From Swiss-Prot:
Bilayer-spanning residue ranges: 53-73, 167-187
The protein's name: Transmembrane protein 200C
GO cellular component, one term: membrane
Coiled coil segments of this chain: none
Length: 621
C-alpha cells in the first residue's frame, strides 16, 4: 500500500502542469543562499609547523615504510623451478647461476646438432666453449661498479617473499595512516577554533550605532562652536534688567526649530549663528559719556547694524523680530517709572554724532512707534524693529534695513513700527492724560517739513516709504496732542532724524526718552482737533500726510515754498549723519488750506516717485 501510494503521488506530480517539481528545490536553494549571505565566515589557517603537523608527517613516513614492507613480502614469483633454486642456492648468487646453466645446456644442444652434419666440429666446440666463460665475467663487472645498488638489493632480496613482511607490512601501513588521520584532525580543529562567524545584521547594527554616535558628537561639537562664536562676538555684558528674557532657552528654541539665522554680528565671524550671538547680547555696558544736556546715560543699546559699514543691510530674521517685540514689552514698565525723571533731560538734550557714533546717540524712542496700526496695514508688511527701553533709559532703533537701490522708496525705515506692543498701548493712557497739551501745529509747517524731507534727500532714512504707509493706512495719529509747540532751540534740530518725527512733533513730555508710546481714543483726538472731522482721515498736520498731497499744495501755493525754503536751508546747513535725536519743537506756520476728502483721495492716488521729483525741481525747493 505504501509503495502504491508513493507511485500515485509521483504520477500526480508529473501530471500536474501548474506546479513543476523543479520549482520547489529552486526556491529552497534561493532561501538557503539568502540565509548564507546573512552570515560571513572568516576561516583560519592550518598551522603545519606545530606538534600536530609533525605527527602528521611522521604518520606519512610510517605509511611509506609499511607500503615498502608489504611490496617486498608480496613480490610475485616466476615459476616453481625458480622457487627450488632460490631455496637451495644463497640469495646473492642464485639469480645469476640459474640462467647460466640454462644457457650452457641450450648451447650444448645446439653445438651437438651442428656438429653432426659438418665435419670440423673442433672449431665449433671451441667457439661454443668461449661463451661458457663469458657470462661470469659480465656478471662480476656490474656488481663491482654499483655497490650501493647491490647493497640495498641484497637486503631486500634476503627478505624477498618473506612471511614476516607479508604480516608486518600492512600493519605498519595502518599505523602510519592512523597517525596521519589523527594529526590532520587536530590541525583542522585548531583552524576551526580561529574561524569566526560574523552575522551581517549585527554588523549593520554596529555600523549604524557608530554612525549615530558620530552624528551626536558632531552635533555637540557644532553646539560648542556656536557657543564659542557667540561668546567671542558678543561684548562684555552689563547687569541685565529685571525684565530681561532668558536667552539660553530662546537660543536653544531657535536652534531646535532650525531657523536660518543670518550673520548679524558685527565681529566679522561670518558664522551661521551670528544672529543668535547678537541676540545673546541681553545687556550692554554703560557708556560714561554724557550728551550736551549734562545727564549721563545709564545704559547703551547695540549699534546701528544697518548704518555700520561692517555689517550688510538685510531684512531681519524671525528670531530678531520676536526678540525685539519681547524686549519692547519687558522694557515698558521701567520706562514708565523713569518718565518724570527724564523729562528735563530730554528737553535739554542736543544733537549727537552720526548714526555710526558711540552709544550716546542711541537713547531716543523710535518715532515710528506711534502709528502701530498703520505699520500693521497692507502697506507695511516689512517687519521692523524699534528702540528698546531698559532700566528707565530708552534705547534707539538699532537696525534698519534697506531695499535694493533700484526700487522706489529705497530708504531705511525705523524699527519701532513692529516693536510697539499693542497691549502696552492701553496701559499708557494714564500717563498720557497727565501730560500737558500744546496747541495744534498748522498745516503749513507740516507741509514745509515734508517738503524739506523730500528735498534734502538724506540717506539711510525711510521718509518717503514711511509717509506712503502712513498716508495710505487711513488711520489717525493717536499720539500727537492738539497743542501748539514752542519754538525750537538752535541746537535741538536734528537733520538726520526722520521727517515722521519732525512732522508728528509731539510735546516734550511725550517725546521723552524713557516714556512709552501712548495712545488716545480717536473720538477725543478728533473732538480736540478742529480740522480732524474728516471721517477717519488723518489731518495734514500729522506725519501721515502723503508726500504727493503736500507737494501739490506747495506747487499750487507760492507761500508754501517761501515758508519751506528757510527750513530746508537749516537742514542742509547741519551736518548729515547726526544721531536720530527727536526735535523738541518746530516753528508754527500759518494755516494755508483745508482739503476735502475727495481732494485727499485724488492726491493720495498720485504716488509715483518720478512725478514727485519733477514737482520738486519745478517748484525750486
Amino acid at each position: 500500500m505504501i509503495a502504491t501510494g508513493g507511485l500515485l503521488r509521483i504520477s500526480a506530480r508529473k501530471q500536474d502542469p501548474l506546479r513543476p517539481p523543479s520549482q520547489i528545490p529552486k526556491r529552497k536553494r534561493k532561501a538557503k543562499k539568502r540565509r548564507k549571505n546573512d552570515v560571513v565566515v572568516v576561516k583560519g589557517k592550518l598551522k603545519l609547523c606545530s606538534i600536530s603537523g609533525l605527527i602528521a608527517l611522521c604518520g606519512i613516513l610510517v605509511l611509506l615504510v609499511g607500503i615498502a614492507m608489504a611490496v617486498v613480502g608480496y613480490w610475485p614469483k616466476a615459476t616453481g623451478t625458480n622457487r627450488e633454486g632460490g631455496k637451495q642456492l644463497p640469495p646473492a648468487g642464485s639469480s645469476h647461476r640459474v640462467p647460466t646453466t640454462a644457457n650452457s645446456s641450450s648451447s650444448g644442444s645446439k653445438n651437438r646438432s651442428r656438429s653432426h652434419p659438418r665435419a670440423p666440429g673442433g672449431v665449433n666446440s671451441s667457439s661454443a666453449g668461449a661463451p661458457r666463460s663469458t657470462p661470469p665475467a659480465r656478471a662480476a663487472s656490474p656488481s663491482s661498479s654499483s655497490t650501493s645498488v647491490g647493497f640495498f638489493f641484497r637486503i631486500f632480496s634476503g627478505y624477498l617473499h618473506s612471511d614476516k613482511l607479508k604480516v608486518f607490512g600492512p600493519l605498519i601501513m595502518g599505523i602510519g595512516i592512523f597517525l596521519f588521520i589523527c594529526a590532520n584532525a587536530v590541525l583542522h580543529e585548531n583552524r576551526d577554533k580561529k574561524t569566526k562567524i560574523i552575522n551581517l545584521r549585527d554588523l549593520y547594527s554596529t555600523v549604524i550605532d557608530v554612525h549615530s554616535l558620530r552624528a551626536k558628537d558632531l552635533a555637540a561639537a557644532a553646539a560648542a562652536a556656536a557657543a564659542a562664536a557667540a561668546s567671542s562676538s558678543s561684548s562684555a555684558p552689563a547687569a541685565a534688567p529685571p525684565g530681561a528674557i532668558p536667552l539660553n532657552g530662546f537660543l536653544s528654541y531657535v536652534q531646535s526649530r532650525g531657523l536660518e539665522l543670518k550673520p548679524g554680528g558685527c565681529g566679522g565671524s561670518g558664522d551661521a549663528f551670528g544672529a543668535a550671538a547678537m541676540l545673546a547680547k541681553g545687556s550692554w555696558p554703560p557708556h560714561p559719556a554724557a550728551p550736551s544736556g549734562g545727564r549721563p546715560r545709564g545704559a547703551a543699546s547695540p549699534p546701528d547694524l544697518a548704518s555700520s559699514p561692517r555689517c550688510p543691510r538685510e531684512p531681519p530674521s524671525l528670531a530678531e523680530a520676536v526678540y525685539s517685540v519681547y524686549r519692547e514689552r519687558s522694557g515698558v514698565a521701567g520706562s514708565r517709572r523713569a518718565a518724570a525723571a527724564t523729562a528735563a533731560a530730554a528737553a535739554s538734550s542736543c544733537s549727537s554724532p552720526a548714526p555710526c557714533s558711540p552709544p550716546e546717540s542711541w537713547g531716543r524712542q523710535s518715532t515710528a512707534s506711534s502709528f502701530v496700526d498703520s505699520s500693521l496695514s497692507a502697506f507695511a508688511l516689512l517687519p521692523l524693529q524699534g528702540g528698546r527701553d531698559r532700566g528707565g533709559d530708552a534705547e534707539g532703533a538699532s537696525c534698519s534695513w534697506q531695499r535694493p537701490p533700484g526700487e522706489r522708496g529705497s530708504q531705511e525705515i525705523p524699527r519701532g513700527e513692529l516693536d510697539l506692543s499693542m497691549t502696552n498701548l492701553r496701559g499708557a493712557e494714564g500717563s498720557m492724560r497727565g501730560a500737558r497739551r500744546e496747541p495744534e501745529e498748522p498745516e503749513g509747517a507740516v507741509a514745509a517739513r515734508a517738503a524739506r524731507g523730500q528735498g534734502g534727500r538724506l540717506p539711510r532714512t525711510g521718509r518717503y516709504a514711511a509717509l506712503r504707509r502712513r498716508s495710505t493706512s487711513g488711520l489717525p495719529d493717536y499720539r500727537a496732542p492738539p497743542s501748539p509747540e514752542p519754538p525750537p532751540s538752535p541746537g535741538s534740530a536734528d537733520p538726520d532724524s526722520s521727517p515722521l518725527a519732525k512732522a508728528a512733533s509731539p510735546s516734550p513730555p511725550l517725546r521723552l526718552e524713557g516714556s512709552p508710546p501712548t495712545r488716545r481714543d480717536s473720538g477725543s483726538s478728533q473732538s480736540d482737533d478742529p480740522s480732524s472731522s474728516n471721517k477717519g482721515y488723518t489731518p495734514l498736520r500729522e506725519a501721515g500726510t502723503s508726500t504727493e498731497s503736500v507737494l501739490d499744495a506747495v506747487a499750487g501755493q507760492t507761500r508754501d515754498s517761501a515758508v519751506a525754503a528757510p527750513v530746508l536751508g537749516a537742514e542742509q546747513s547741519s551736518p548729515e549723519g547726526a544721531s536720530q535725536e527727536p526735535p523738541t519743537a518746530e516753528q508754527p506756520q500759518p494755516v494755508q488750506r483745508q482739503f476735502t476728502n475727495k481732494e485727499k483721495l485724488i492726491m493720495i492716488s498720485r504716488s509715483h516717485a518720478i512725478g514727485v521729483e519733477e514737482e520738486l525741481e519745478s517748484t525750486g525747493i
